[in-house]
């Protein structure tokens, strides 16, 4: 197995560890895409119109022979009703609540996708293709001491990220923040922010509080890691910072023959 350096919070090398075999997994963008889309579609809430909308009327057609279109008309009036082309009528093909949006995926396929996406975080070419700023990083993947798990303030994490050389990527995410198009702006989701570094920890002892105010940064415990965090938008190769304990747990969590 390949060996990799572990860095302190100041950016100094403290020790050397072996990478688990999961980082040698074949890159499978097709499987990764399926896993991410499965997660995205699982969040879609089915919605539809009232099945009786536009149908609450006693309108009936006069029939033929009157020199007028044979559409249902309100009794005592010539006003058309019920049909899609009438004002207040039903919709022709409305959305239905029984539509199935979720694209399911097999458990072993999902595990393969996560393994492949984890391996992609060690591929510098893929990380750069995603647009991450990695010129100051001495190695990919980047492994840091478990001490970072206890950091709880934005001020502390800012200094740590500067010392580690990943602040450039956070600045890129902050500058890339744009106002969305569409009505989402009115519904509490005005901005689109590019994804920055992902911090994978063995145990979250406060780091999520310290890192959450940095643009594009996500923190996840290794037990909860998934394909969408590793490959946002179905594109693998996210800049990922692992703690030493997270690296040690990875091999056991996603074994190759595990169902």
Swiss-Prot record:
InterPro entries: Ribosomal_uL4, Ribosomal_uL4_dom_sf, Ribosomal_uL4_euk/arc_CS, Ribosomal_uL4_euk/arch, Ribosomall_uL4-arc. Keywords: Ribonucleoprotein, Ribosomal protein, RNA-binding, rRNA-binding. One of its GO terms (biological process) is translation. GO terms for cellular component: ribonucleoprotein complex; ribosome. One of its GO terms (molecular function) is rRNA binding. One of the primary rRNA binding proteins, this protein initially binds near the 5'-end of the 23S rRNA. It is important during the early stages of 50S assembly. It makes multiple contacts with different domains of the 23S rRNA in the assembled 50S subunit and ribosome. Part of the 50S ribosomal subunit. Belongs to the universal ribosomal protein uL4 family. This is Large ribosomal subunit protein uL4.
